[in-house]
Amino acid sequence: MEYNHQEIEAKWQKYWADNKTFRTGTDKNKPKFYALDMFPYPSGAGLHVGHPEGYTATDILSRYKRAQGFNVLHPMGWDAFGLPAEQYAMDTGNDPAEFTAENIANFKRQINSLGFSYDWEREVNTTDPNFYKWTQWIFTKLYEKGLAYEAEVAVNWVEELGTAIANEEVLPDGTSERGGYPVVRKPMRQWMLKITAYAERLLEDLEEVDWPESIKEMQRNWIGKSVGADVTFEVAGTDKSFEVFTTRPDTLFGATYAVLAPEHDLVDAITTPEQKEAVAEYRRKASLKSDLARTDLSKEKTGAFTGAYAINPINGRKMPIWVADYVLASYGHGAVMAVPAHDERDWEFAKVYGLEILPVVEGGNVEEAVYTEDGPHINSEFLNGLDKAQAIEKAIEFLEEKKIGKKKITYRLRDWLFSRQRYWGEPIPIIHWEDGTSTALSEDELPLVLPVTSDIKPSGTGESPLANLTDWLEVTRADGLKGRRETNTMPQWAGSSWYYLRYIDPNNSEALADPELLKEWLPVDIYVGGAEHAVLHLLYARFWHKVLYDLGVVPTKEPFQKLFNQGMILGTSYRDHRGALVATDKVEKRDGGFYHMETGEALEQAPAKMSKSLKNVVNPDDVVEHYGADTLRVYEMFMGPLDASIPWSEEGLEGARKFLDRAVRMIENSEIKAENNGELDKVYNETVKNVTERLDLMYFNTAISQLMIFVNAVNKAKALPLEYANGFVQLLAPFAPHIAEELWVKLGNEAGISYVAWPTFDESKLIESEVEIVVQINGKLKAKIKIAKDLAREELEKIGRESVAEALEGKNVVKVIAVPNKLVNIVVK
């Protein structure tokens, strides 16, 4: 008999809401557990089945920890500023605030339908002035510390979006992550955050957190620490010079040309008249490319000769100076010494332009291919014969002694481009005065509320639409000095860089959060979300947290103690013979195969990311309606390891529902007795032990497997002790909370399973109390019998003879060999 999931789930969701069951515990005598989801951007599309995977994981842990006696903070909120809402508003003429509010209501409805145990009294919304007052407050603190500053920088400008975007938001093909629009480089006045001031700490403190090694490595690579030397090169025949940063000063003898970034200040001054036109044209083309496109290793190398030469400081040789876009103005000093024998990009460039390739490390044929392995130095005078480490040390000594270079540490990490030329974001709380000074708003002037307007199209001047709102824009100080508010707004990353702190004290109007509460709840114990946020969000949040730590606002160096990245739930999709993906509505199934409806071509089934274009997005509303929220939760946790990417399967969903139906039948149909005959002792105690251990490890799929093993065992047993029925329902509750609440009451318990103490297991019951032995006559198997474990030899012999009494009739027993817990062999004549 199937249970009515719609009725049961609605009933218990109402019970939890009415009773405020999941209000955060405040008992100071209990340990704390802070389970955090990466809060969603509330898009118009609503949730898809990928969202609940991570949310279910944190919900299971939260329910488990409540039952273990923890105060649990499990909140949810909305990352609601940003480009998508504004783009939608511009396309449709709707107000982004209204659109966002509708989307949030829909997301909240969907989330509640899945039975997640969020404390909704903690809900935050990044677009709420009571929230972004503190985002702005953090900005003013960054400004006071010199960590927020204005600079004229070449930005990634996207004409279609009317805004500049960060390097991290530019795709490898040179288009924008949002919308796939062309990105061009354009100098503009921008707000920058000095994340580089924290580079070393961001690197070092990765050792203190329990994060996937792959994510740590991505952050290390993004920060990109390099130890090397700054080397000064003079320009031949002039009084000019430039600096180069190199991680390999030991290869200076192999430097045969120099390359300047197209934006380098020296280019105009040193380019000869004959080369001016070619260099100017090259620089123009380079200005249209993004940094990512320029540094793409696979692209063909291009450049222009300046006509000038540098002097190699280690041997006095002249080296031609080129301009090439594979060198970025923002890295090192915007100049490189090219060692084509031992650097792939330099080698490719040298091959294109016929430049000298001089090996200085032994091994390989550098005319045929670049040699990047280690080896003894050659062609390097006083460095000859030394290995890499020795040669680097000696080269730096030489440079410092001659005052032509010095040891240097650099980072790939660039300062964070923080301003956006858009409307739908937090206003930056700065006023620019007509006397050329700028001031930040004081705390009592915050929040600086985003003004309501129907005109949110980009201004076209490079400023945001706020530049059009003169009533809001123009201010006059008490002494009559006139000023203009900052018109740029903050990027979407701003609110998400600190939102986890506001959950701790969401209604505080006097401070970002109460220091005592921050001390009580930080750091976050488990943070679950997608690996796509490895660099941006996680790095920015760590940076802001460290600034707040330095200000004495937060008590911990790191925000998130443990990070877990759930895998992706893939959709069903199909490929044709060319490997092209075919939308599901163009596919028909017949004769056990899949065919293109229009062409009749046989297609291959292949999992792919769910997308609207492939029409393979599964809406959780449909799953909840047909199968129930508990089924969806159990299925998504049973699909495989939580961090694996696995294709969605309707059959798997049906399997999860069948398991829940069997669990219900087990409770409803078993003979449940107060007394215990011991028959299920071992499997029950194993189940409690295994489920508990696997929850601690987040091995949710194998925890569910163990629950299935228990159900199978009960179906073969004569009776189910009430204690074990209750215990099973408690173990099921984190995974399938609605049906567990229902079964809990059916077993005669008071409503409300959430805070009932988690079951414990008896170690002694994990040991088999019975063993199966074989009984042989003259070495031939005659019977298998179950007996009490560790019986004395005499007792064993007696039971063995009795079990084969018929076969022994008329025979003369010579001797009986009994091996405890194994066998009885009766020798007869």
UniProtKB/Swiss-Prot annotation:
This is Leucine--tRNA ligase. PANTHER family: LEUCINE--TRNA LIGASE, MITOCHONDRIAL, LEUCYL-TRNA SYNTHETASE. One of its GO terms (biological process) is leucyl-tRNA aminoacylation. One of its GO terms (cellular component) is cytosol. Belongs to the class-I aminoacyl-tRNA synthetase family. It is an enzyme of class 6 (ligase). ATP binds at K612. Its EC number is 6.1.1.4. A motif ('KMSKS' region) lies at residues 609-613. It is found in: Cytoplasm. It comes from the Bacteria. The keyword Ligase applies. A motif ('HIGH' region) lies at residues 40-51. Signal peptide: none annotated. It catalyses: tRNA(Leu) + L-leucine + ATP = L-leucyl-tRNA(Leu) + AMP + diphosphate. Coiled coil: none annotated. InterPro entries: aa-tRNA-synth_I_CS, aa-tRNA-synth_Ia, Leu-tRNA-ligase, Leu_tRNA-synth_edit, M/V/L/I-tRNA-synth_anticd-bd, Methionyl/Leucyl_tRNA_Synth, Rossmann-like_a/b/a_fold, tRNAsynth_Ia_anticodon-bd. Pfam families: Anticodon_1, tRNA-synt_1, tRNA-synt_1_2, tRNA-synt_1g. One of its GO terms (molecular function) is aminoacyl-tRNA deacylase activity. Keywords: Aminoacyl-tRNA synthetase, ATP-binding, Cytoplasm, Ligase, Nucleotide-binding, Protein biosynthesis. Its main location: cytoplasm.
